[in-house]
């Protein structure tokens, strides 16, 4: 198995698809990376040489924020919003949607399961 950015890349998949197993790399980014490395996107990971894997690793390490660094950066951005006390920060703090969705009904994913209120009947 090829190991790039601390992630074991599946050997039996095409390079373009296998790179998406890394957090922070989507199909579009994977296409750009393979083009920059000069590797055909249809090639299987098992057919890559060690030099090509090293080249992919270098491109990803130097040009992309991935895995733990990206997760940390996102968490710091959310924490900064919460510390500022802006509307988006308050919504994050309360666990509610922060992009304008309705919350009277729906928003169950963000709010979690319903909490029953004792003594309340229709």
UniProtKB/Swiss-Prot annotation:
Gene3D superfamilies found in the cross-reference section: 1.10.8.50, 30s ribosomal protein s13, domain 2 (4.10.910.10)
GO cellular component assignments: cytosol; small ribosomal subunit
UniProt-listed InterPro entries: Rbsml_uS13_C (IPR027437), Ribosomal_uS13 (IPR001892), Ribosomal_uS13-like_H2TH (IPR010979), Ribosomal_uS13_bac-type (IPR019980), Ribosomal_uS13_CS (IPR018269)
Swiss-Prot/TrEMBL keywords: Ribonucleoprotein, Ribosomal protein, RNA-binding, rRNA-binding, tRNA-binding
GO process annotations (BP): translation
Region ranges (Disordered): 96-122
GO molecular-function term, one example from the UniProt record: structural constituent of ribosome
Database matches in Pfam families: Ribosomal_S13
Similarity comment: Belongs to the universal ribosomal protein uS13 family.
Reported function: Located at the top of the head of the 30S subunit, it contacts several helices of the 16S rRNA. In the 70S ribosome it contacts the 23S rRNA (bridge B1a) and protein L5 of the 50S subunit (bridge B1b), connecting the 2 subunits; these bridges are implicated in subunit movement. Contacts the tRNAs in the A and P-sites.
PANTHER family attached to this UniProt entry: 30S RIBOSOMAL PROTEIN S13/40S RIBOSOMAL PROTEIN S18, SMALL RIBOSOMAL SUBUNIT PROTEIN US13M
Complex formation: Part of the 30S ribosomal subunit. Forms a loose heterodimer with protein S19. Forms two bridges to the 50S subunit in the 70S ribosome.
Protein name: Small ribosomal subunit protein uS13
Native organism taxonomy: Bacteria, Pseudomonadati, Pseudomonadota, Alphaproteobacteria, Magnetococcales
